Amino acid sequence: MSINRPCVGPVAALAAVIVLNAVAARPAFPYGAVQNKADNTEIRIVPAPGKVVIDGKLDDWDRSGEIFMFVDENSRDTLSLTAAMMYDRDALYIGGHWKDPTPLMNQTAFGGDVSWAWNADAIQIRFISNPAIRSRASTMTGARMPAEEQAFVNNITLWHSTTDGKAGYQAAYTLQYKDNVLNPPGVQGMFARDADGKGSTFEYRVPWSVLKAERPLAGGDAVQMQFQVHWGNDQGTELKTGITDVRNPASNSLGYMGPDAWGLGVFMEKGNLPKIDRVATERAAGHVPVKFSLPNPGKVSISIRDAAGKTVRTGIGAEPYAAGDHTWLWDGLDDRDRPLPVGKYTAKILTHEGIGQKYVCDVGVSGEPPYQTPDGTGGWSGDYWEPSYVATEGDAVILGTGNAEAAPYTIRTDLEGRKQWGTTAAGHTLAVHKGCGYFVAWASDGNLKKFDLATGRMTAFSGGQPMLKAPGAGPRRGLAAIDANTFALSSESEDKLYLIDIASGEAKGDVPLPAPKGLAADGKGGLYAVSGRDVGRVDPKTGAFTPIAKDLDDPQLLACDAAGNVCVSLRGKTMQVWKFDPAGKVLEKFGKPGGRPTLGRFDPAGMLQPYGIAVDANGRLWVCEADREPKRYSAWNPDGTLWKEFFGSLPYSTAGYFDPQDPEKFYAMSVRYLVDYEKGTWKPDATILRTRVEEGVPLGVSPAHPVSVHGGGTIVVRDGRKFLFSAGDRDSFAIFEEQGDAWLPRASLYVATTEVPGPVGKNGKPGPVKKVKTTNFWLDADNDGRVQAGEIVPAGNRFASTWKMNIDAHLNIYTLQGDGWTEPRGEGRATTPFSILRLDCLGFGPGGGLRFAEAARPVVTDAEGGSVNGIAVDPDGSVYVLVSGGLVGRGERAQDTGARLVKYSPSGKEVWRYAKVHCGFAWSSSSYTPGMLVAAFRCSSSGHPDLLPVTGYYGQYFLVDKQDGLFVEALGQDQRSNYTLDQTMVLTENFNGNIFKHPQTGKT
């Protein structure tokens, strides 16, 4: 890849295949991104002109107060909502026209979990039914709303249930979403599909009593309210994109956070209102010509520099142009819209014909394909927790982790392991019975849930509810159907089995059994249980237990095969699944004795922490291995040999990292994978680290993870020695060194908590104990990989701040002195000056241990200031800093706020800046337009010689030319647009990303 950069003219076309190593990080489940708009700050609510018939026609409506809401300019003709509201003495009316290419697709049934009705085609309305209330409450700002005011808060969801074929109305009250109601008396609703199938008309009548209004609202009243409009996927199973509108443009809160973000519903005394013309304000055309020519259609980026070479105006970025001669007109203003003095200015121009994206693979995630697809068959299960449960019935295999954010909690596969659907139905304990699945959760609510195996959707018990309170408390690991009408549920801490009526879900008794865990029915009227360390048959009428195998090695859960044999998952030193016949004879042992190691090379022949198990119709044993690095579901042939293994999902937005000398070694968290970039394949190679504590020193960035999930790690080679650096969110980092297949700890920054007795009081007793926190630094001075107390010192002046830490190719550590970014909570500019400090690595001591300077020193000082989002460092010491200028209000130019991406030379001098930047979550931003670093979250890495990637929160990666600071391209898609769910879509809450130039092939 070569770039020619003449001033005032085109550069050579830049065309390349970019492979960002975010392959380990793709969420496998659509993850909602809602654009917070303020095209409308209020809606005018007019008197109903007469009797209103709820028939979906609106021909008896006065629509003069209606407003128009849409996703973005590219889709305003296909994704929009025109909404109107009316009132009379009895009710509030809500109606309008809803444009959607696949209208009225929402599979939430009235007998299902209607609290998820928002997760497809749905209209949400937040409405305070008391006009005397004006609240700025928000969980973002911490402002509170008194309970007496919250009584008037309505959180309403309107949808057409595809399953029921009717309009639904679900509401919860207060900001805590209490007292849920479904289709309460007096509410009427109707949706009518358009003749062309590209939209629908809807209308609702909602009595004032349902809205908790103290009186009918009328002309002269105004209330806080907001619309939130969701467009789901083609199947109606999950949210694709959405908007909020009727919004307070000065708020940076999201709608669900509280009324600080809401606009107004203004009740008019009369109808037939004159139309309000909304005039869009546009910038005046420029007058200073910048000319360029393209031999072929391409994309153009321009910035303006003054005589000293300083960037004064960020112009266009990757703007598409046809072949031929063109002129871009500059208006003579700087990035803050200030006139520039007369003088000599130079235009820097970059052109290219497009950057191609080549999909390689999704490391650590199974599925065909491993990324989410519109039909729900792509990707894998739960990104949180470890593999926990599996059950089979007929040709269905149901498995999952029980917790997730960006992947389905639970999935169904066929007997070959091909995913068929994903669902939010989940718990800790799973059983399947006659076409339905049943979960028991262990949390305080202890819910018993029922779902349909054909669709994954919640379905109702005989009493009409899909979710009930399960009997018992604490871990309830076993659930099995002992006959056609009864479940047995084990309660380990209570030493009993509960009996549950399958049809109603109601408890109908219990029997004693010591320390029960797994349960399994043999299909012939027999029930097996784990009791303590034994496996045996249990009489569900009396609790009488007859062991068939005693003193097993930490037995967990059970499964029976078609012949009535029973399998048990064993841990401890065994790490296998054993199959017994009814007499207790061992028929088969699945997996390598002792399992696979917790640290070191991955051995597929061994299990690790086997837990949930099931035997399918082909006699294959499915095993959930309850470990997270990696997450593996293994499937075994009846003869005990491994058949297949399935992996994932990784925690959402896991940041992958790589060995710069050998990029085929790719890492996600603490697992090393081997990637073949040409074949697009991967396999786990080793687990390199596990968390541990020595002498009070955590050898990792958190108690759960040695390597940061979202931050990943950086591998650095110095003097032939290979090190791994990973920084936590705050006040933590760890350095490890590779020694064969092991990585030994070499340094740790951490917060220590010491309990200090209070001063002795008059009674002669010490006062309350105080917890004192100090930041300590451990350095492995003798290079033995062990912690000695004498190696621990206070961090002192080595680290001014531990926010946005980074490391360079020489093991120098960079930290921020100044304000680290947090999402702005209010108006105002961020202008605090900042410095980037460097703690120099001084090489190695006599014993081979790392040595660092006693204090960090500033290498960049920026008096203009701002809050820092990210730092990246080149091998030559050049520093890149991503800076936020504070809150960008809806409709405000981010370019005018002081937000910027800046490159500083090794001496700390500004080299260039790029000002089309909206940092952080950018909740008030519009979807991506060419050249905009929208929701810029971090400098992804600095491992490429020519390109600096910046991670976008909504699923994009922005490439900036390192030499001149020109925008090159945006990869991926903004999820707040009408995106395509395919291999280029990373989805929202994207924190990861990395880039490298392959040392052997030269490919980026």
Residue ranges, per PLM feature:
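Glycine-centered tight-turn motifs at strand-turn-strand junctions
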Residues: T311-L340
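Surface-exposed loop and turn segments in beta-propeller and other repeat-based domains
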Residues: G367-W380, T459-G472, L587-A605, F647-L650, ...
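Conserved beta-propeller blade signature
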Residues: V397-G400, G437-V440, T486-L489, G526-A529, ...
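Glycine-centered coil/turn sites that cap beta-strands in beta-rich domains
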Residues: A280-S303
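Residue-level detector of Asp-centered blade-edge/turn motifs that repeat once per structural unit
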Residues: T392-G394, V432-K434, A481-A484, A521-K524, ...
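Short loop/turn segments immediately following the C-termini of beta-strands
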Residues: G402-N403, W442-S444, E492, G532, ...
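Structural preference for beta-rich elements and adjacent junctions enriched in aromatics
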Residues: R26-K275, M805
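Signature of short aromatic-glycine-proline-rich micro-motifs recurring in repeat-based ectodomains
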Residues: G378-V390, A426-H428, P471-L479, P516, ...
